[in-house]
Amino acid sequence: MYSVEQSFVEWLAVKGYAASTYPPATGSEFVTVERTGGEVADLIDHPTVAIQTWAQTPMRAEEMALSIRNALFTSRPQGIANIAVNGLYPFWDESTRLPRYQLLLNCTAQLTD
């Protein structure tokens, strides 16, 4: 079964980012992927996806987010037909005290097995 989160995690790994659907216990620089909503109709999935970049400095977290955003304009994760970047903004994490940036994406994917 197709997973939009897994597709983004695999794509980010190819781009050189340590990515997961949850933050690791340790690490100073990583990326998380989370489906935050969206609708499904007639075997077409329209997920809203949040990609969060975490780093030691706000500048590096933003740099990572911008790099990922720019890469999305030239290649897409498997199964994703269309991506619109809906937002890019700082999103501090109070629990880890690490700087974090978030990309909010609206996507279109075909549901297939």
Question: Would you name each region that the model predicts?
Answer:
Residues 1-17, 28, 34-113:
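Charged, amphipathic alpha-helical segments and their flanking helix caps
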Residues 18-23:
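Short, well-structured beta-strand/strand-turn elements
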